[in-house]
């Protein structure tokens, strides 16, 4: 989808597939721990999530911040808020409040915009385990009912808001797309599946082939594979046929896609299923293990390698370059950051520090805390001291004055380069709309006297007025903010 491939209009729906998978996995972990121990260790649960998610995210945020400081200083003002929202896992609400569109933009979209989905997931991880533990007092069935009811309510909220405010056409649907309240149906359907489907608990590969019910079991597995194959075809159909401005999508379509995805996951999760074995080939396993890093890095990489802007070429070579860079960076992150930390690298470092000091525990804690505090303070001061040019808000309407009318010669344009923003060189306006007006003509230089003035000179526009035919306005509803300005100019 982000490669702008026209034959995959629904590529953005991959996020919803991962929502269902995340809801399924997290709920499975919580339910099985509660059933096994009678309680959930929230401390260990969130520590595991932190070790899995935070190192790669912090590496991304640090890399993006440094890159912006060095090469994209004009975007620092907006990036500061984006980074803070990402650290707090509220990016989706941050972009809703800033009226940022996921589907339409002028110039470079926010480099961290894709973190909205991680914010939705983390907000779910924060609340859902508490609900599961409370509902588990009445068993799995209660958890399933709660999940299904909440999934339906989320779908209804999206549908009602879409109908009331005209989403997705004529108005932009980003509010209901970003919102946790309106886009949680995938996570919740995955959670419901986790309470109803855990075939690995009853499957013993050593005896599965000799039990009396061999025929019946193999038949059920075959049915599961057939349904899974049909579900896979359904997901592919969504990707190839349903675009971001489909009314169906916002009036129940996301719930349908989530249900189809849940059926696919159910088939893949069966340990005896043929479909699961087919999807477990090494290339797919490789991508699956690194999927988090691939998702984190793909959007920033794509935003600094745009065809026609940072890159002067387009086509499949550019696509291969962008994908290759993403996979390479994700591999480095997985191998040298995510995996070591997940396997206890920080704990081993602290153990070594404790072993080398008289009062090791306090010294190790102070060392780590001091390094983190110093890094955060340095990062915050660096961002605070950098000023963007110009510090315009995302939703502001930008009014720019060109260097000359369309009839100006190349020499005249070069003679006054400071009279216009560097639009042709690719500087981006993150505003929702823009107005481009021709400026007054440059002051005349020394010229030779003409032998004789024309008999009837053509009338020229009054000073301070602009010929309306020379005005071009681009944008959507926010362009109305420039109406008074245009009227004053003529």
Give residue spans per PLM region.
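Hydrophobic membrane-embedded alpha-helices
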Residues: 1-387
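Extracellular/periplasmic envelope-modification machinery, especially enzymes
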Residues: 162-163, 215-219, 241-242, 309-317, ...
């Amino acid at each position: 989808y982000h490669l702008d491939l026209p034959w995959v209009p629904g590529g953005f729906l991959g996020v919803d597939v991962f929502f269902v998978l995340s809801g399924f996995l997290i709920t499975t972990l919580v339910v099985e721990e509660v059933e096994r121990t009678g309680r959930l260790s929230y401390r260990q649960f969130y520590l595991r999530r932190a070790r899995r998610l935070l190192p790669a995210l912090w590496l991304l945020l640090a890399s993006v911040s440094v890159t912006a400081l060095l090469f994209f200083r004009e975007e620092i003002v907006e990036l500061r808020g984006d980074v803070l929202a990402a650290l707090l896992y509220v990016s989706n609400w941050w972009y809703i409040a800033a009226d940022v569109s996921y589907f339409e933009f002028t110039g470079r979209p926010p480099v961290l915009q894709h973190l909205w989905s991680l914010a939705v997931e983390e907000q779910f991880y924060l609340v859902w385990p508490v609900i599961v533990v409370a509902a588990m007092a009445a068993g799995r069935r209660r958890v399933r009912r709660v999940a299904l009811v909440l999934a339906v309510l989320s779908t209804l909220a999206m549908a009602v808001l879409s109908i009331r405010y005209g989403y997705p056409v004529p108005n932009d649907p980003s509010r209901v797309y970003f919102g946790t309240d309106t886009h949680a149906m995938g996570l919740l359907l995955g959670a419901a599946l986790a309470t109803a489907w855990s075939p690995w608990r009853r499957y013993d590969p050593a005896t599965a082939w000799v039990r009396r019910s061999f025929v019946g079991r193999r038949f059920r597995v075959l049915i599961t594979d057939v349904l899974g194959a049909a579900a896979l075809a359904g997901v592919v159909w969504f990707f190839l046929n349903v675009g971001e401005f489909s009314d169906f999508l916002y009036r129940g379509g996301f719930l349908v896609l989530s249900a189809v995805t849940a059926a696919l996951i159910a088939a893949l999760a069966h340990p005896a299923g043929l479909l699961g074995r087919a999807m477990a080939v090494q290339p797919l396993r490789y991508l699956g293990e690194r999927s988090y890093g691939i998702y984190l890095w793909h959007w920033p990489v794509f935003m600094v390698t745009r065809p026609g802007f940072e890159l002067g070429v387009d086509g499949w070579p550019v696509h291969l370059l962008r994908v290759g860079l993403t996979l390479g960076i994700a591999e480095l992150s997985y191998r040298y950051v995510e995996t070591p930390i997940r396997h206890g690298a920080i704990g081993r470092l602290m153990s070594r520090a404790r072993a080398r000091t008289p009062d090791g525990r306090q010294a190790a804690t102070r060392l780590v805390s001091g390094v983190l505090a110093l890094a955060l303070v340095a990062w915050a001061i660096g961002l605070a001291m950098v000023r963007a040019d110009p510090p315009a808000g995302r939703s502001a309407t930008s009014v720019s004055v060109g260097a000359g009318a369309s009839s100006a010669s190349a020499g005249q344009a070069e003679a006054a380069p400071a009279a216009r923003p560097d639009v042709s060189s690719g500087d981006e306006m993150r505003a929702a709309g823009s107005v481009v007006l021709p400026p007054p003509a440059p002051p005349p230089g020394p010229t030779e006297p003409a032998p004789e003035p024309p008999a009837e000179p053509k009338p020229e526009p009054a000073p301070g007025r602009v010929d309306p035919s020379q005005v071009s306005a681009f944008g959507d509803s926010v362009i109305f903010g420039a109406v008074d300005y245009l009227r004053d100019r003529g």
